[in-house]
Amino acid sequence: MNFAIETVNLNVYYGQNHVIKDVDLKIPNKGVFALMGPSGCGKSTMLRTFNRLIELNEDARVEGEVRLFGENIYSEDVDPIEVRKKVGMVFQYPNPFPHLTIYDNVAIGLKLNGLVKSREELDERVEWALKKAALWDEVKDRLNDYPGNLSGGQRQRLVIARALAMKPEVLLMDEPTANIDPVGTAKIEELLLELKEDYTIVLVTHSPAQAARVADYVAFLYLGELIEVGPARKVFENPEHELTEKYVTGALG
């Protein structure tokens, strides 16, 4: 099997606090892979190791390997900026740039990184990304408006479009529906099912129900340890570990 991300003996510390403990994990290429577990189990920390965003925290220390399509992204000769071009990130709170128009929110990464050669190419890429994020039809007549008037779900899809415009190979999502209403959540979950045909999506979720709805594979983390990993249906219908069973049935919060 072709793996998009592999961790080898991954350990993460915040100061003296050991938050990810000896995790070996393989994330297949393409599809939705959910990291699930209760609050404080290390899900978001692990996600941030996959694009080296963890290094923005001065107290963080990473040991072991994280391989992106076979390459250890923590090797000394690897530029974290180049890693983040390949690995997009969507955060829990919809965070479009409020001072930029809808158009410029999508275009900014392309401009800053010189990824397009003409205004025509930029227009095409912005339209493509907004269509990929299932937002084009809702905003095509107001691209010069600011995102403040968009709903929470629309703002999050705008952020997804901003990430997709860079044409990443992997998309990391840290509880992307946690602060969005049920209608917006349903649209984003539907979008994930479409995007997984072309991307590897790693989704952090506190909701076993959401993982069951959208994930092809799931990993259950508890207190920084990888308890169980496998195809979503198997983990939910026939978990091997008692802790996993308690979590997916709601007995462990």
From Swiss-Prot:
Catalytic activity field: phosphate(out) + ATP + H2O = ADP + 2 phosphate(in) + H(+)
Residues that coordinate or bind ATP: 37-44
MF GO annotations: ATP binding; ATP hydrolysis activity; ATPase-coupled phosphate ion transmembrane transporter activity
Superkingdom of the organism of origin: Archaea
GO biological process, one term: phosphate ion transmembrane transport
Domain ABC transporter: 5-248
Record's signal peptide: none
Pfam families: ABC_tran
Group of enzyme by EC: translocase
Enzyme Commission identifier(s): 7.3.2.1
InterPro entries noted in UniProt: AAA+_ATPase, ABC_transporter-like_ATP-bd, ABC_transporter-like_CS, P-loop_NTPase, PstB-like
SUPFAM superfamilies, per the entry: P-loop containing nucleoside triphosphate hydrolases (SSF52540)
Statement: the UniProt record of this protein carries the keyword Translocase: yes
UniProt-annotated location(s): Cell membrane
Keyword Heme set for record: no
Mode of membrane association: Peripheral membrane protein
GO cellular component, one term: plasma membrane
NCBIfam families in the cross-refs: 3a0107s01c2, PRK14267.1
Biological role: Part of the ABC transporter complex PstSACB involved in phosphate import. Responsible for energy coupling to the transport system.
Protein name in the entry: Phosphate import ATP-binding protein PstB
Source organism of the structure: Thermococcus kodakarensis (strain ATCC BAA-918 / JCM 12380 / KOD1) (Pyrococcus kodakaraensis (strain KOD1))
Organism lineage: Archaea, Methanobacteriati, Methanobacteriota, Thermococci, Thermococcales
Gene of this entry: pstB
